[in-house]
């Protein structure tokens, strides 16, 4: 009997140690979507300097820190896979945050093949339920 109680207590402690619970994810309309307007998949970008134009439908844009229903802001994933969709999105060279509500951004990438993908998140940089992310595209910066 004591062992069962101890296991239950341990399970509760481990569960409450996670940063976000699924029930805490902000809802998003099922028909909402994010997409990359430009560049297009397979685009060749001479010089490596370009604007990324970000699209959103079925939801609204709000800066980080502003909690309004069905809103959030964009994050651009560069040369990386989607992070865990129930945690805060990292902020590093591969996870670019546009917390002011930007819908376009200037990038400069070195020569090579690069992937780009958008991930929409709430005021605390956590993806919604269901999560909104674009198709991953590949661009090429020639030498």
Describe the role of every protein-language-model region:
Residues 7-17:
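Bacterial N-terminal signal peptides
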Residues 24-47:
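Short, compositionally biased P/S/T/A/G/V-rich stretches that sit at domain boundaries
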Residues 48, 110-112:
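A glycine-anchored, Pro-Gly-centered beta-turn/N-cap motif
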Residues 55-66:
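Short amphipathic, basic-aromatic surface patches that mediate peripheral association
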Residues 66-74, 133:
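Short coil-to-beta strand junction motifs in C2/discoidin
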Residues 83-85, 121-129:
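Short acidic/polar inter-strand loop motif in beta-rich domains
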Residues 130-143:
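Short beta-strand elements
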């Amino acid at each position: 009997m004591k062992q069962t109680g101890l296991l239950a207590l341990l399970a509760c402690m481990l569960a409450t140690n996670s940063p976000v619970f699924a029930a805490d994810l902000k809802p998003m309309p099922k028909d909402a979507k994010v997409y990359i307007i430009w560049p297009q998949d397979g685009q060749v970008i001479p010089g490596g300097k370009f604007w990324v134009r970000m699209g959103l439908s079925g939801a609204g844009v709000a800066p980080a820190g502003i909690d309004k229903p069905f809103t959030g802001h964009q994050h651009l994933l560069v040369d990386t896979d989607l992070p865990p969709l129930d945690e805060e999105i990292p902020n590093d060279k591969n996870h670019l945050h546009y917390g002011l509500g930007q819908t376009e951004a200037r990038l400069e990438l070195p020569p090579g093949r690069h992937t780009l993908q958008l991930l929409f998140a709430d005021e605390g940089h956590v993806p919604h339920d269901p999560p909104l992310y674009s198709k991953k595209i590949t661009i090429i910066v020639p030498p």
